[in-house]
Regions:
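Short, small-residue-biased leader/transition segments that mark boundaries at the very start
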Residues: 1-2
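Charged, glycine/proline-rich intrinsically disordered loops and linkers
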Residues: 10-34
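Alpha-helix capping and helix-coil boundary motifs
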Residues: 13-20, 84-87, 177, 235-238
Length: 254
């Protein structure tokens, strides 16, 4: 798999510019702000870019998005109740269409979840992480994934759903089973599987696969475990660990 991430597709790395987005909405309102974002997006990633990615020999693009591409609040108020008129779905529709046209698969990556899945800038949480302690935000996340899975369940160009990017929590975890990240993963998997039993689901251990449970014991099927190994110096050693985990747990590792 040769992957390219279309970073910035969802408007100027919105998850790193939460305050800027809020200021725009305060000054110009939600509608005018969405018009500005739409104009930016349509010029930031174009058909030429997708065609060029394909020509480079890539076969997969990872498309990061956050909840505010679809919702105006972390409680889950839709920008438009009609999915066909929702700017988030309009943009994903276009990207998936272009990917299919140029022979690419798409990984749909929820980069920023309602309430924030970490305190890092990439979650758009402005130094706050409330997803794992706020059931309302979890409900909004579930509704968004159900809508996404319902919309793209028949799409041959969609390779996988990456449920949440680099989830982190504060404090120590006594066991893998008690990890609120895995509890939330389990909830999202069950919700998605009710509407889409076929697409691959990607689950991130971030830096260590040991943060994730045995998928067979958890009852998770058709999943891929994912790591983001920044700054590894002993690449061969780490890759051997991933290989051993793959063999011992019978789960693909990416």
């Amino acid at each position: 798999m040769y992957k390219r991430q279309v970073q910035g597709n969802s408007a100027v790395e919105q998850w790193t510019n939460l305050e800027s987005l809020n200021v725009l909405e305060e000054r110009f309102g939600v509608q005018k702000t969405q018009e500005l974002i739409k104009q930016y997006e349509s010029n930031w990633i174009t058909e030429w870019d997708i065609q060029n990615i394909s020509a480079m020999g890539c076969n997969v693009i990872r498309v990061p998005f956050w909840y505010r591409n679809f919702m105006s609040t972390p409680e889950g108020a839709w920008l438009s109740e009609n999915p066909d008129e929702n700017p988030g779905f309009q943009r994903l529709d276009w990207l998936i269409e272009m990917a299919e046209k140029y022979g690419l698969y798409v990984v749909l990556d929820m980069h920023g979840c309602p309430g924030g899945q970490s305190t890092d800038h990439c979650s758009g949480s402005a130094r706050k992480s409330e997803l794992f302690t706020n059931i309302v935000y979890q409900d909004a996340m579930e509704r968004l994934w159900i809508e996404i899975a319902s919309r793209y369940k028949e799409s041959p160009a969609v390779a996988a759903y990456d449920i949440m990017n680099e989830p982190q929590i504060n404090g120590e975890i006594e066991s893998v089973d008690e990890d609120p990240r895995n509890q939330l993963y389990d909830r999202m998997i069950k919700a998605i599987r009710k509407v889409d039993p076929n697409h691959i689901l990607m689950l991130e251990g971030i830096w260590s696969l040991s943060a994730l449970p045995d998928p067979n014991e958890a009852g998770w099927n058709n999943v891929v475990y994912e790591v983001h190994p920044y700054g590894i110096t002993d690449t061969d050693s780490e890759c051997e660990k991933y290989k051993q985990y793959n063999q011992s747990h019978d789960v693909p590792v990416y």
